Curated annotation (Swiss-Prot):
Alpha-conotoxins bind to the nicotinic acetylcholine receptors (nAChR) and inhibit them. A synthetic amidated version of this toxin potently and preferentially antagonizes neuronal rat alpha-3-beta-2 (IC(50)=55.7 nM) and alpha-6/alpha-3-beta-4 (IC(50)=90.69 nM) nAChRs. Belongs to the conotoxin A superfamily. It is found in: Secreted. Keywords: Acetylcholine receptor inhibiting toxin, Disulfide bond, Ion channel impairing toxin, Neurotoxin, Postsynaptic neurotoxin, Secreted, Signal, Toxin. This is Alpha-conotoxin QcIA. Negative results: shows no or weak inhibitory activity on a range of nAChRs subtypes, including human and rat alpha-9-alpha-10, mouse alpha-1-beta-1-delta-epsilon, rat alpha-7, rat alpha-6/alpha-3-beta-2-beta-3, rat alpha-3-beta-4, rat alpha-4-beta-2, and rat alpha-9-alpha-10. The cysteine framework is I (CC-C-C). Alpha4/7 pattern. The keyword Protease does not apply. GO terms for molecular function: acetylcholine receptor inhibitor activity; ion channel regulator activity; toxin activity. Residues 22-48, 66-83 form a propeptide. Disulfide bonds join C51-C57, C52-C65.
Length: 83
């Protein structure tokens, strides 16, 4: 086997390793993004619940609590929009 053939096989091995590593990394990033999104949703829900249970926070941020109430009771059409 000549030097040129050995070098070609070496490049082929490096390229295939890079491709496999790149695709595996992208697949794991997709799973991480989904987990991050779920964690962010849980954090937002906790902050929303704590704010809406505190009258001064609920008064300061009515857009958050109004949205929470509408999600809990979507048939309630009597809610006035916040100014």
């Amino acid at each position: 086997m000549g030097m040129r053939m050995m070098f070609t096989l070496f490049l082929l091995a490096v390229l295939s390793t890079t491709v496999v590593s790149f695709t595996l990394d992208r697949a794991s990033n997709g799973r991480d993004a989904a987990a991050d999104s779920k964690a962010a949703d849980q954090i937002a829900q906790t902050v929303r619940d704590e704010c809406c249970s505190n009258p001064s926070c609920a008064q300061t941020h009515p857009e958050i609590c109004r949205r929470t109430l509408m999600l809990q009771n979507p048939l309630n059409h009597d809610m006035s929009p916040s100014a």
